[in-house]
């Protein structure tokens, strides 16, 4: 059974600072499209202070600053301690529409990490974490164990923290449940030492990615059932965090070139295509700042 938080307040964080909008591929994940309030997902991106300091200190947080960086062929290299996080939040009322088996809001508050914004309570359903521990970054995606279709398409793999290290996709049904993801003793020890709420035991590492593909050229894939499938382009079979973010770049005007920006719609996998990056400087795998107005 999913773990419960000792109290609701102990699993709360600061308010969400992005709007909640209807996802463009709701039907793929069985996500509701009508109701009160209007079903929506709030997707926010956060960066740790080390990454923030590097970006601001080098004037890389404005179009003018990026244009100046391009003019002097500045090589963007985030500090090794840089971390970026993407979290997807769903209003608790919508959670009950999406998964009626949750029964009531009180149960959601026990099973999910929650917060409130503008008098609306949200539950965290998915989490991307990227860390610059190597040149290509380390990419990991996490899902709440109750996410419908959590391991669909690519399966779920965690050789360190999951007692069941490999869960294959259910090819007989889509958006089914995959059960709990009980943690190994080493991971539970780390979580206990960090004084984490037990509610985090309900979140599962889906897999990680550190390179573009295998030695034989087969591209690696990594996608989240909510972030890529419901909010993104609707599929996981051609999703790759590292391949998509390799095209994060800017041209002479401080904005992504048309060819680089166009790759976002194609779910690129495998090694980057050099010609796409012609006339661009890479932004060390970070799209978010480049896409800001």
Describe the function of each predicted region:
Residues 1-243, 247-293:
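Conserved small-residue
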